[in-house]
Each structure stands twice: as C-alpha cells, then as structure tokens.
Amino acid sequence: EMIGSDWSSDVCSSDLYNKYIVMNFDNEKLSPHLYKIDSSKLLLLDFGKFDKKDYSYVCQDFDDSFYHALAALKEHLRKYQRLVLLFPEDIKHPRSSCQYFNCFCQDYHIDSAIVENTDRIQVRKGEVYIAIRQIEVVNIIKQSRTTGLKCGEDFGLIAYNDTPAYEVIDQGITVLSINWEELGRKAAEFVLTGQEIRTYLPTEVHLRNSI
C-alpha cells in the first residue's frame, strides 16, 4: 500500500503491516513518526544522510559518489569551457551535492556555475549542463533544436537518474544514476527474508553521446 504525505501516525504505531518500505522526503533528517516503527520492520530507501540508528536502509550517496562519478568523466568534460549544474530552488535533491560539485570543479580546475533559476537558462556553445530533473533535460533539448546547437558537439548534457528515454533522445543522454533494479531487488529481499541491510548504492556513469 502506498502511503502519502498526509498519512496518519497511527499507521506507524500499529501492527497493520509486517514490513514498511519508506522513501524519506528529507535527506538530512528522519521523520519522527518513523521512530515508532520496530526497526526490524522498516527499510529506508533513497535519501538517508542522517542517523539511521538500527534501521535497515538502501540509500544513495549524493556527495562523495557524485564527486567520483564526475571525476570519471573529467576528460570528457575538459572538451567544454564551463560545467553548469542546474539546481532549481524548489528541488528536493540534497543541496550538499552543490558543495561536492564545487569541490570537484576546484580540484580539477574546471570553470563552473550553479544555476537555480532554470526557467531562464540559455543553452550556450561550449557549456555542459547537469540536469537533475527531466523537465530541464527536455527544455535544453528543445531549445538546442530551435537554435541549431548540436548536443554532444556544441554543448554537453548530463542527466541524473536513468530512464529508457535517455537511451534514445539525441542518440543518447549521458546519465549519473544508481542501479534502480538493484535497489528493487534489495528491497524485495528485505521483505521476503527480514534480513538486515545497510548499504549505499554507488552512483554509476552511463556514458552516451551527449558529452
């Protein structure tokens, strides 16, 4: 059963379910309601940069793993004049990624920028963009087709979290992503066996023609 943000805390304090699979909506803190759940019954997914106590979890690392994924692409990124992270003000993505983005760019001497007002982004020749949300990917591709700029040649594009569409858009969009199938397998294993699991999935690079 899917439980939305308006769910009652009674759900947590009861024995309605044998297992709870929860994707926390804050990377920095755990909802206090969840502390009412027996740790043997709860699995936390995705966000998790907080004290998870005795709870099982399968989380993303939005910091070091993000840095190392960018480092794996450094030679491709050097083809461009500037690396731009699109980070809308209202995004749920952890802000700590911005710090590690800045660290990467400083360590490898790459000119960079973080853009929060993504509605006004102008695609420019010589820049490579990291788009966390799919809407920014779509807007950049649409704008480039209007201006005649070619993705992977005139400018670069990196998306976050892989989808089947990214494999075919403009001959393939390079992606930074965890293995979502592996996350699903580990969640199913927890439900079926009840065995404790505490792991961060690595951010993988799917290199395609967009950079």
Language-model segments: residues:
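Flexible loop/hinge segments that line or gate small-molecule binding clefts
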Residues: 25-64, 161-172
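An alpha-beta-alpha
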Residues: 67-106, 199-211
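Short acidic low-complexity segments
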Residues: 115-123
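Single conserved hydrophobic/aromatic residue that forms the stacking wall/gate
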Residues: 1-11
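Flexible loop/turn connectors
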Residues: 123-128, 135-211
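Short, conserved loop/helix-junction motifs that constitute active-site signature segments
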Residues: 34-39, 77, 148-152
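Periplasmic-binding protein-like
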Residues: 16-25, 82-88, 125-134, 156-158
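Hydrophobic alpha-helical segments within soluble ligand-binding/sensing domains
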Residues: 48-84, 137, 177-196
